[in-house]
């Protein structure tokens, strides 16, 4: 797409149709909005965080937005291109449960070593609690990030090695539907 975000070429639309769950019309509509918000075709961390602040005005979404930004930014060039944006949106809004869980696993596995440690999960859960602020009432057994992480590890960490593999995460998510429900924070309702 060059330096300036221009109209999508037919081959770009076709490629995005193959890589996402969106139709040609939807891709063009999303691109139009993306170009309006990011005329240079690049969504920065600052811009991404502002979007989260609109959705979570009573908390501080900056830490969580940073974690999500890092997953969206597939090629790690410091910004989100339209293609990266649309592919992540496709998975989080229309992907299968397993695709959403793979995406979430990548989000939680902060150092990309193939495991989610207790500290990594605590970082993410703490960021989520900061983001939602006081707007969400949590049950006593989950009213702190530490309690939530302990509960998740009780359910998921089958071999008790203090780290979660993707298989443990997948199986645990099936046992604890609240994991899936948390993923629908990203869901546009079009799944």
UniProtKB/Swiss-Prot annotation:
Keywords: Calcium, Lipoprotein, Metal-binding, Myristate, Repeat. A lipid is attached at residue 2 (N-myristoyl glycine). The keyword Repeat applies. Residues 24-59, 60-95, 96-131, 144-179 form the EF-hand domain. InterPro entries: EF-hand-dom_pair, EF_Hand_1_Ca_BS, EF_hand_dom, Recoverin. The keyword Endoplasmic reticulum does not apply. Ca(2+) 3 binds at residues 157, 159, 161, 163, 168. Ca(2+) 2 binds at residues 109, 111, 113, 120. It comes from the Eukaryota. One of its GO terms (molecular function) is calcium ion binding. Pfam families: EF-hand_1 (PF00036), EF-hand_7 (PF13499). Ca(2+) 1 binds at residues 73, 75, 77, 84. Belongs to the recoverin family. PANTHER family: CALCIUM BINDING PROTEINS, NEURONAL CALCIUM SENSOR 1. Binds 3 calcium ions via the second, third and fourth EF-hand. Neuronal calcium sensor, regulator of G protein-coupled receptor phosphorylation in a calcium dependent manner. Regulates neurite extension and branching by activity-dependent (Ca2+) influx in growth cones. This is Neuronal calcium sensor 1. It comes from Aplysia californica (California sea hare).
């Amino acid at each position: 797409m060059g330096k300036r975000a221009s109209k999508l070429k037919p081959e770009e639309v076709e490629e995005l149709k193959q890589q996402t769950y969106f139709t040609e019309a939807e891709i063009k509509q999303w691109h139009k909005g993306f170009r309006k918000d990011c005329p240079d075709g690049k969504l920065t961390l600052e811009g991404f965080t502002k979007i989260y602040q609109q959705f979570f005005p009573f908390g501080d979404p900056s830490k969580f937005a940073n974690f999500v930004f890092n997953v969206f930014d597939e090629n790690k060039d410091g910004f989100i291109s339209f293609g990266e944006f649309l592919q992540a949106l496709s998975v989080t809004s229309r992907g299968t449960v397993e695709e959403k869980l793979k995406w979430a696993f990548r989000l939680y596995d902060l150092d990309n070593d193939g495991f989610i440690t207790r500290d990594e999960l605590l970082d993410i859960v703490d960021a989520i609690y900061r983001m939602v602020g006081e707007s969400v009432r949590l049950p006593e057994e989950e009213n702190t990030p530490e309690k939530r992480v302990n509960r998740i590890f009780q359910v998921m960490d089958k071999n008790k090695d203090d780290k979660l593999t993707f298989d443990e995460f997948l199986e645990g998510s099936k046992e604890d539907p609240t994991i899936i429900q948390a993923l629908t924070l990203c869901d546009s309702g079009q799944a």
